[in-house]
Amino acid sequence: MAVSSLGPEGMVDLNKFRLRRFVEKLNKLGEVDVIEKPTDLSDLATLIEENLRAIWFKDVGPDNLEIVASVNGSRYRLAKAMDVSPDNLVSEYRNRLKNPQPVIEIKNPDAPVQKVVLTGKDADLSRLPFYVQHQLDGSPYISSAIDYTVDPETGTTNVGCRRLSLRNSKEAGTNLTAPSDLKRIYTDACEKG
């Protein structure tokens, strides 16, 4: 896949694909329940599980975080993410898989993901909104975390979206029992020692 530093017109619209823009769009379509009142992290799982709509929590936990859940929890919302009707969702997925777009690289410090960078003692995973999601969870989790790995054999980048389990302030883990590219990369590395 080609890498470009600029978009097709020489400019990158940094807001076009922001999660906040999509949630605002869904909210205008009546697909989001907005919870303004303070919400404890321990209450999230029940509130999310009981609701079929997306939920936008405006004030969660001691740090007063905003959290959104179930954004992709229906075919309708997935279709809206791709600007197609639900009837055209599968064909749109197939079309996009067959026609990958070039990667647009945004250099530091312009990348929105680089607005807050914590290092050393300031890098503390427990400051993120991990919470117990299911009755039998052995630890708090964060949903829809993006993991990024590079296959050492091929150099191919692998990106996955998984639940991460909080181990301590510096470590999180994930489940590698389900078939995935990450599991294959891990298994291959273990076999090589």
What are these regions (language model features)?
Residues 2-193:
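Extended, highly charged
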